[in-house]
């Protein structure tokens, strides 16, 4: 049996951020980070589909404590993984990380004020605090709609979350079902890999924010020349964050104007044979769903090649040669990719762990969320989620620091346990836990997640 102060479960962006802040702001605190996979990095080392990259700029995506050195403002997954590896090594965190170690169960005892955690290998770790940084979706189960007749298709049918690295698209006809961040990333990448044709088959359009791919712009050069590399980079980071906040606020306050602006931009970028009003005019408002980043307008550039196209219709059924749309059109393909999103964790945020407090199993709907990082009736447990309308890392860094402040406060006052209490909170005061966006996968999992206390100032 091993005894430590803090156990972090998950070694993606949030887990690495938590490890850094504990090592820096909680001196003398013993901790470990468990990762069930053989490689750290979370999403960025797990997904393998062509073109996988950030859907936000690297200034805001990078940690506040680690400068991003790559030349691209939009980074591919391999650069992100290298960045995370460098961050871990530069700050001496690798000694605390244990790969290939999953957590089966965790039980809290109020008598001892400790968590007892059991790993898949049968090991036991006793800790004071448990931090969950396992994300929000299921790794093993992507969101796959029930497409009729998919077993009849004679070609290759894959989900983007389960992309086989050996799959060769050169000379092949490809259909990508979906129009979100994954689809807008894959379509240009598939063209670059030599696909004969790529059809983006979307049930409904999305908004695309076109931004430059390279960060060596005039603003950064001027700031670094005036204030030096470190301060100039810091200023550029916050200017970029402010720009994103302004775009989001504009979309919320001036909904009609924001919608028309994005549609007008799509009209300018579309080639003549693509009808922007049909394929790039969503029925919802800007930022009602996450905005898709299109670096250098690569999706529109792919459309201009004539090898990529967009079809706006639903999938009626699969046929032997491809997909039949609701309008009766048969789209022939050698490869069909379902880029239809993620399946959220059930019993969030416990992932696949069995969790109990004093012998009572955790059941999400019976708990309230406190400040977007704790759960009522579950002592000494924190979870970390990023933003849905900005870079994930910004909130992950902030919540990791908040955790450190809380355990330091407990230490200064001789306390051993912290537990949000829902006493006095009526059922009518609860609001659904929904990550603020209406994306299909988020709303599907709302029933399996704890409600928010209506007066909670910090929902996720």
Where in the sequence are the language-model features?
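Glycine-rich beta-alpha-beta "Rossmann" dinucleotide-binding loop(s) and their flanking helix/strand
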Residues: 130-161, 193, 305, 331-364
């Amino acid at each position: 049996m091993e005894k430590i102060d803090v156990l972090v479960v998950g070694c993606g962006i949030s887990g690495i951020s938590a490890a850094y802040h504990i090592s820096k702001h909680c001196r003398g605190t013993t901790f470990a980070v468990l990762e069930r996979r053989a490689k750290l990095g979370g999403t960025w080392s797990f997904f393998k589909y062509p073109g996988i990259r950030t859907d936000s700029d690297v200034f805001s995506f990078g940690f506040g404590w680690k400068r991003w050195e790559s030349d691209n403002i939009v980074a591919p997954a391999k650069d992100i993984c290298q960045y995370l590896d460098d961050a871990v090594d530069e700050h001496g965190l690798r000694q605390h990380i244990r790969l290939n170690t999953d957590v089966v169960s965790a039980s809290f005892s109020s008598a001892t004020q400790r968590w007892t955690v059991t790993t898949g290998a049968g090991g036991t770790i006793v800790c004071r605090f448990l931090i969950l940084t396992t994300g929000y979706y299921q790794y093993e189960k992507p969101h796959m709609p029930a497409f009729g007749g998919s077993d009849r298709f004679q070609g290759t049918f894959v989900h983007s979350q389960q992309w086989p690295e050996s799959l060769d698209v050169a000379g092949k006809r490809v259909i990508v079902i979906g129009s979100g961040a994954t689809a807008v990333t894959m379509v240009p990448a598939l063209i670059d890999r030599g696909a004969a044709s790529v059809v983006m088959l979307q049930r409904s359009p999305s908004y695309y924010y076109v931004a430059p791919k390279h960060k060596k712009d005039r603003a950064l050069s001027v700031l670094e020349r005036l204030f030096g590399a470190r301060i100039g980079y810091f200023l550029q980071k916050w200017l970029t964050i402010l720009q994103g906040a302004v775009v989001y606020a504009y979309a919320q306050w001036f909904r009609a104007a924001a919608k028309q602006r994005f549609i007008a931009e799509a009209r300018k970028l579309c080639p003549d044979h693509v009808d922007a009003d049909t394929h790039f005019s969503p029925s919802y408002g800007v930022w009602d769903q996450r905005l898709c980043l299109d670096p250098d307008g690569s999706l529109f550039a792919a459309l201009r090649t004539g090898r990529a196209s967009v079809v706006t219709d639903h999938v009626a059924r699969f046929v032997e040669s491809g997909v039949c749309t609701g309008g009766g059109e048969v789209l022939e393909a050698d490869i069909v990719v379902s880029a239809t999103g993620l399946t959220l964790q059930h019993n969030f945020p416990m992932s696949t762990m069995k969790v109990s407090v004093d012998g009572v199993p955790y059941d999400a709907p019976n708990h309230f969320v406190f400040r977007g990082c704790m759960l009522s009736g579950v002592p000494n447990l924190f979870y970390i989620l990023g933003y849905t309308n900005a870079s994930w890392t910004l909130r992950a860094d902030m919540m990791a620091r908040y955790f450190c402040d809380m355990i330091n406060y407990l230490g200064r006052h001789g306390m051993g346990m912290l537990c949000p209490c829902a006493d006095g909170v009526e059922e009518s005061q609860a609001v659904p836990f929904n990550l603020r966006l209406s994306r299909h996968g988020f709303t599907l999992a709302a029933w399996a997640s704890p409600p928010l206390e209506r007066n909670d100032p910090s929902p996720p």
